[in-house]
């Protein structure tokens, strides 16, 4: 048996248990047909950042601590006069996780952060996009234990997009359920 000390626990479980289970359940003929996680994108939209520049920097730091990877600022693509928004203004923060960091983040999200949500009954099963990807919103970044409650500028939410190679929502839901995602019944 090989040493899996540096490979994330979820990745090991995916290779050893989930792939054979899904090949049997869906009748795939090759391992390459089995859906897998491609990336996880975390993003925060900060419309208030136009007035308060410190908020954007604090959000970059928060997302960096949550993900373990440096976050980048996103810019407005179009000007919208009603929102006093100009093209090129920095109005959001995002980070894309792949490989080991992706599996480690998903493990922390499922086993540490989501159980800390007040009155948590599972994530919504209605977050699939029809092409095997799942999106969910988190209302407070303080559910992650890495965030120090005393040092945060403002409580804000973030979007979590899980991109898979699944062709259908059913395949993606099965994959995420086997990885431990607690869907509402």
Swiss-Prot record:
GO biological process: translation
One Pfam family hit: Ribosomal_L5
Coiled coil: none
Domain of life where this protein originates: Bacteria
Keywords per UniProt: Ribonucleoprotein, Ribosomal protein, RNA-binding, rRNA-binding, tRNA-binding
Keyword 4Fe-4S: no
Signal sequence extent: none
Keyword Ribosomal protein on entry: yes
GO cellular component: ribonucleoprotein complex; ribosome
Gene Ontology MF terms in the entry: rRNA binding; structural constituent of ribosome; tRNA binding
InterPro entries per UniProt: Ribosomal_uL5 (IPR002132), Ribosomal_uL5_bac-type (IPR020930), Ribosomal_uL5_C (IPR031309), Ribosomal_uL5_CS (IPR020929), Ribosomal_uL5_dom_sf (IPR022803), Ribosomal_uL5_N (IPR031310)
UniProt cross-references to SUPFAM superfamilies, sorted A to Z: RL5-like (SSF55282)
Quaternary structure and interacting proteins, as annotated: Part of the 50S ribosomal subunit; part of the 5S rRNA/L5/L18/L25 subcomplex. Contacts the 5S rRNA and the P site tRNA. Forms a bridge to the 30S subunit in the 70S ribosome.
Free-text function comment from the UniProt entry: This is one of the proteins that bind and probably mediate the attachment of the 5S RNA into the large ribosomal subunit, where it forms part of the central protuberance. In the 70S ribosome it contacts protein S13 of the 30S subunit (bridge B1b), connecting the 2 subunits; this bridge is implicated in subunit movement. Contacts the P site tRNA; the 5S rRNA and some of its associated proteins might help stabilize positioning of ribosome-bound tRNAs.
Family (UniProt): Belongs to the universal ribosomal protein uL5 family.
Protein's name in the database: Large ribosomal subunit protein uL5
Gene name of the encoded protein: rplE
């Amino acid at each position: 048996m090989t040493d899996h000390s540096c490979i994330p626990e979820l990745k090991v479980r995916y290779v050893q248990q989930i792939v054979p289970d899904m090949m049997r359940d869906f009748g795939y003929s090759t391992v390459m047909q089995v859906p897998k996680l491609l990336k996880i994108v975390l993003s925060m939209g900060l419309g208030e950042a136009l007035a308060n520049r410190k908020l954007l920097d604090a959000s970059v730091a928060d997302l960096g601590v949550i993900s373990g990877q440096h976050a980048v600022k996103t810019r407005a693509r179009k000007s919208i006069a009603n929102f006093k928004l100009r093209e090129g203004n920095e109005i959001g923060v995002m980070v894309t996780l792949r490989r080991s960091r992706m599996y480690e983040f998903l493990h922390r999200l499922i086993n540490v952060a989501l159980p800390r949500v007040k009155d948590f009954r599972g994530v919504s099963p209605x977050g699939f996009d029809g092409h095997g990807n799942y999106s969910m919103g988190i209302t407070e970044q303080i559910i992650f234990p890495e965030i120090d409650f005393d040092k945060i500028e403002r409580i804000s939410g973030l979007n979590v997009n899980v991109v898979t190679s699944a062709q259908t929502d059913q395949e993606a839901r099965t994959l995420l359920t086997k990885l431990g995602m607690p869907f509402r019944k």
